[in-house]
Amino acid sequence: MGNSFGCSASGERLVSAARDGDFVEAKMLLDCNPCLAKYSTFGGLNSPLHFAAAKGHNEIVGLLLENGADVNSRNYCGQTALMQACRYGHWEVVQTLLLFRCNVTRADYLAGRTALHFAAVNGHARCIRLVLADFLPSDKLNSLPETGVVTAKNKSEQSALSKFVNKAADGGITALHMAALNGLFDCVQLLLDLEANVSAVTFHYGTSMDMIGAGSTPLHYAACGGNLKCCQILLARGARKMTLNCNGWLPIDIARMWSRHWLEPLLSPNSDVVIPAFPHSNYLSLPLLSILNIAREFGLQSATIGDEVDICAVCLERTCTVAAEGCEHQLCVRCALYLCSSSNVPSVTVGPPGSIPCPLCRHGITAFKRLPSSLTREMKLPMSLGFCAPCMLHTGDTTDQSSPTCPPTEQRSSKTRAASVSSDIFCPVTCSPFPSVNIPMCTCNEGTCPNFETHGTERHSEEHVESSPSRTTTEQEKIEEGQRLGKTTTCSSMFWGRRSCSRENQCNSEINA
């Protein structure tokens, strides 16, 4: 009971080590008691995995998962470690969590946000690419057409990709709405290439920003954000200028209300401005799923077989275990996985859209295949990703190690491959236990941004202004406008009101302590 309610001194030491990135301390504690990996704090129910993922300590994330930490554990707000990693843009942590087969479709309790929403709102395109990797198999896709829409041979896989990308949070806000509002062009471009619905509208009920209105499209949100390129690519991909939201406002009306005057020539219904053609996103990665599946099944360690094994030409440390389809150049699993996860080179110069340039010949890679002589099935346990240097504390062979406190059935279940994602698990309307309230939206790319207070705060401000009779009506209006627009907030407070925000702050205050 002490472990569950946060009364364990050793558990708190592990939390501190995970937060501070103290790998030596964390390993010592887990060697003494592997069950500490499942510890959770008293207030926010954050596990050490949440702390390590939020802070980007990838080696500790791998250590915790190897010692039995639940990769899908939730905190008090229903957020997983994957959501924390996507929130702060730690793509290497996201990659490690995917190797341990985390559930990317889970939504939090506050506003029904998935890891995709957390990555999109803060502009982390690499995290978006990784989160959507399991929905984009390279061997099931044709070439990307000029419209930028992915065409899948298997309709069920296409439907699963489309449903997850367009999964709505509270109020009907999709990841594309969030990226468009904050002017994050790379994320908008990538989401559009991956079947994001350019005509998706927010719900006619629930939360929606008062100054944008319910029933708004991503173009309405992009007009509020003020990013010209985001508006251009939305129009190029089929967004309509004449779409009215529930308030009867066009996108150009939103731009005028928010003083985005530079958008008026583009969004005007009678505009003759030429919309440029946009290429496919540099963050598309077709071979990512193939190398992820190889790493999941066989691990990241290379099996040494004799003296004739080729050494990876990229790292010059490990043996070659996979080969690129097409050019047949061989790499180790780690380098191939790192290449697919970090590359953002325009695919036009190397091959089909979404292909990754081979580091040896620049040929476009669309998939990887394993070398049968170099990988053995005994190495199914995924290891943490340390691309720069091997772990100084790793001793002995870990393939046959087992936790003395975990039964064999649990060990076998953790190594089994995850089932394919069904298209029936997605619900178009997000169920949230908390009532919907006004959404203060963020329109900035950096730092702080204007916020809209709740009606209770506005009434308090009005009473304060009315208490000074010497002020004229014009002065009162200016003061009210300044109070309404002057208060600043960050992008993380977009989708919930006071009650939900207090719950969010309770969880995050532990991590950011």
Curated annotation (Swiss-Prot):
PROSITE patterns: ANK_REP_REGION, ANK_REPEAT, ZF_RING_1, ZF_RING_2. Pathway: Protein modification; protein ubiquitination. InterPro entries: Ankyrin_rpt, Ankyrin_rpt-contain_sf, RING_XB3-like, Znf_RING, Znf_RING/FYVE/PHD, Znf_RING_CS. One of its GO terms (molecular function) is ubiquitin-protein transferase activity. The keyword Kinase does not apply. It is an enzyme of class 2 (transferase). It catalyses: S-ubiquitinyl-[E2 ubiquitin-conjugating enzyme]-L-cysteine + [acceptor protein]-L-lysine = [E2 ubiquitin-conjugating enzyme]-L-cysteine + N(6)-ubiquitinyl-[acceptor protein]-L-lysine. GO terms for biological process: protein ubiquitination. Residues 397-417, 455-483 are annotated as: Disordered. Its EC number is 2.3.2.27. This is E3 ubiquitin-protein ligase XBAT33. The lineage of its organism: Eukaryota, Viridiplantae, Streptophyta, Embryophyta, Tracheophyta. The gene is XBAT33.
